[in-house]
Amino acid sequence: MKTKPEDNMEFHTYRGYELLRQEKFHLSPSMEDYLEMIYRTCKKQGYIRVTNLAQLLNVQASSATKTVQKLTEMGLLAYEKYGIIQLTEEGKKIGDFLLKRHQIVETFLKNIGVKDNILRQTEMIEHHLTAGTVKNIDILNKFFEKYPEIHKLFFEFQKH
């Protein structure tokens, strides 16, 4: 039996492609945090400066500059020394994925009753999840939203 070219191809969902793209760039958790913050800020004002980025992430400007330069070399940012930082199209796609992942994990933690250090816990968890796990967490979040009576039962069960 002859195989068609597509028989040897590996297909993925949108999120799967996003994860592959992320792996292609070999982004460290720290680089993901930078890209996510740049994306958040650029969504609002179109650009960000290194000093502002450093303040938002509570790091030294020199550290922010080094990471911005690496992300620029990877083709995710457009940046010239002492200038503004903007996202390339590829940077926007990955930034959007990273922000959505963050929001999904944060919502999940709230849905299971976490009240303390939600931001810190989200940051600690989000970098270690596969795209499939994020998708399943998102489905659970939507399930709780669609069926609030079940969510209420979960909280009742949690008390025992």
Language model features with spans:
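C-terminal regulatory/oligomerization modules of transcriptional regulators
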Residues: 5-7, 124-160
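Canonical helix-turn-helix DNA-binding module
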Residues: 50-82, 89
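Short glycine/proline-centered loop/turn elements that form peptide/ligand docking sites
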Residues: 27-31, 47-48, 63-66, 70, ...
